[in-house]
Amino acid sequence: MESIKPKRAVATMACALMASAALAVNDNDTTRRADSPDKPLTSAEIVAKPRRATVKTPVPDLARIYIGSGVYGNNGGMNCGGFCFTYWNPTKLKYDELVDLCAKEEVGNTLQFWQNNDTLARLTRRATKLGLYSTCIYSRATNGIARAMTEELGDRWLGHDFGERYTFSLYQNWDNRGATLDALVDEYMNRVHKHVNNLHNDGWGNVMATSANFSLDYEVAAGTEVPCTEDFPFGDLTLASALGRGLYRQYDLPMWGSHLAHEWYSWIPHRNPYKMKTLETAFQLKYMTGAKMIINESGNWQLQSSLCEDSPMSMMPITCRKLSTKWDKAAREKYEKPVLKEAEKRYSYIDYRSPVATKYRNIIRDFYAFCKRNPAPKGQPEATWALAKGNLDLGGSGYVAGSAVCGAYDLARKNPNWMHGLPEMSWDTVRKSVMPMPPMLAPNKNIHFSATPYGLCDIASFACDNITAEHLLKNYKVLMFSGWNTCSPKQYRVLCDYVKGGGVLVIGLCHLSTDNARNYTDPTVEKLVNGGDFTELCGFKVKGQTPRRYWATGPSTTPNCLGFVARRRFGYMCLPLGDLEYVAPKENFEELAVDDEDADPFIIRCRNGKGQVLFMNWWSYPAAANMDVGCGAEIADVGMVGYLYQYAAKLGRGNVFITGPDFENPDEDCRWIIYSYFPDEGKVYLLNLDYERERKCVLQQFGDKDFLTLKPAEFRIIDSVKLDADEKLNAE
């Protein structure tokens, strides 16, 4: 029973998890009270406190990466009911047998234990004797066991993972307290901060967080040291890597990793011939995007999931229709006992001997063998442009119509802006333009794998305004805002210094608002930072709003840098624009898109110092201006804002990039390819996401051009230039 409680909670909230609004698995009232400090701090006070000193986690010499899987108890019986969720637990294997089998079959080099106290200490000791590394998740230990265990294991111990412990606490009467995003973050971070400190004080070592939520940056800001996104329920694995890698660089963390919940959340049926191929692809993707620890959550030692429509689990007896049934002795007597003998005859469908579990182990074993032949690349991949995750962006990495930000459904009844809306849609806008998801699993949908035709990017978190212009300039040529942001004078100073220092900033009116209560549909000049005086950042002041404008177009009959020409319309827009008073010299400005009636600017290039701002001049979030059904619109168009993001991403290219045969732009084949370049290793990695067709690209590295043809699903490694520390475009 130890392993199923979290899974039941996660299963019921699968869709919401992908929107980062789900209840965390162990985040009940008891846990909240235990984690709530007596004297709470503000989030600013928390981030101002010195962080625990850490070093980069050393990687194994043999593979240079930790490849592992979860260790669960197998006690036999029905663990929960539900006509879609019935989950049976087989009897094979016992803990010790599993540890031994992992070492014998070389199913990776790491085990993630779910056990507690002396059992945990004994199993990790056994794993160490067999040459394996250990970590744990949700584990508890008393009487100094944790410290004694970690000191004994030394480098064989990787840290404690508190899993999906946290969510935003709207169980309190927030409405009468005047709910703000700031208040939610303060309460959230206080609980994380206290728990992380307790784990450190108990001697657990590095603290990890595994979660599908998009608020992982606030857990890191509160003291967590190793972010491990729960990949697959998170959604886009490439975007998840950008978040983990960005936090790794920003907070100088020991490492970042991935928790592959493939069995639960890959969601495609076994009848799809590429069901298991996607697990192999996930391992390759994480390897080539910089993860140094990859844990396969389940599937290889026994099956758990009921979220695959034709999983062998669906062939087990189903007697209890409601998942909400309290699973106690009476329930077992009623629902389990009558069919237990029948179920036992089918344990071979779901235990480690089953064909599906064997496939999982074979894929992990083969990937570990690959890593021993091709050790994971040193350092992190080059990522020279970033997506900004704005301050107080708590909604999620995409739009879910029925989801409320922070689960604030009560607040949303009075203020519908607490429901997902244009800020969350704007994440979809930027992702679809520069991180497309090809239909690689047809007829099933691909919701997990995005290509990188414009190269890898990081996510730069503005959580708590805890970021500096120095960090941004050392790492990113281009910084693009899309989703929610609450601006402040401190943040405005960072943005000004970034642009003056040479950065390219893509930002809009909405992102410079100081609103912290989701009142974004009622924008005013008074809510803008500096009262709308953006002279230092952009060279103009915002005086107010123009009348609504309905169509955008190019300013000239000659195509500009975005490819826009006059009379090719983008829209409908239906948006008021910023009424601007220009302060800087006229030559500092270039109008890139204007309205088709009076030529009021939609998008303006504002040159400033060594850098520039690509300014979105409408009173709403970017997605509001990306509808594209106007004169000249084509099927493959990505919208006005989409083209802006693509142009900016090209400005952010590093030493290595791919294009089509025009040598300038990614073509359709590039939209099926993930690539990365590791300057410390001197290698380029390319992965064709198309399982059925060759895909071609021009690999451009350090001025050279190579025409490549990747076979279906090919993962290719190419020698490149190894850079010295002062030559790299990212500061490690």
Residue ranges of model-derived segments:
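Carbohydrate-binding surface patches
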Residues: 380-420, 474, 496, 600-632, ...
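Helical hinge/lid and interdomain linker segments adjacent to catalytic or ligand-binding clefts
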Residues: 92-103, 114-121, 125-128, 425-524, ...
